[in-house]
Amino acid sequence: MRWKTILLSIAPLLAAEALTRGQELIDRMVARVENDIILQSEVSALGHYQQFVDGKTESDGKILDRLIDQWIVRNEADTARFPHPSDAEVAHGVGRLQASFASTEEYESRKKQAGLSDLDIRAMVAMQLYLSNYLNSRFRSAVQIAPKEVEDFYQDAVVTRAKARNQAPPALDASREYIQEALVQRGINEQADRWLKESRARLRVAKFLSEGAK
């Protein structure tokens, strides 16, 4: 479900960090969710993170929708007293993020362009892990993958891609575990999408974004 991107609720942390660094922020409320509020600084902070990770940002309206989704997941996880990731898990997540860039130089350059510190990034990764781990825990047991689904994915995706690259595809048995997990993750995303849609319909939400930002 674009979990690179439920881009999980680091925006308030970044907004607070920006204020403590003395940056000039003109803040205003852009949404009310139940008894909580979402600020323009949170939308801006998530946009900076998207710029860092993807090299581009969504519209403020789409970012606000993501923040509302994050609120839903975070509220559920906090209510369930779901455990936060360990320091080792966070460090591993930061390492994986760094490895997703072509080079250390590109990572540092994009980090600087986005105005993020190492502490910002660690906070982002920690919260992203917290929320994605919660969704995994909540929905994994409901996802069942039939053997034929694995075989179909192998033929339609793995074999087709290998042929397009003029490469020999890996054996099905060697790919089975990877394919199984990919299909489980897709199922979790689908379950989470449905749950979020149902949850949003029950929420009291008021948005105050200007028309041009939607």
Task: Enumerate the predicted regions with their spans.
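Sec/Tat signal peptide C-region and signal peptidase I cleavage site
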Residues: 18-22
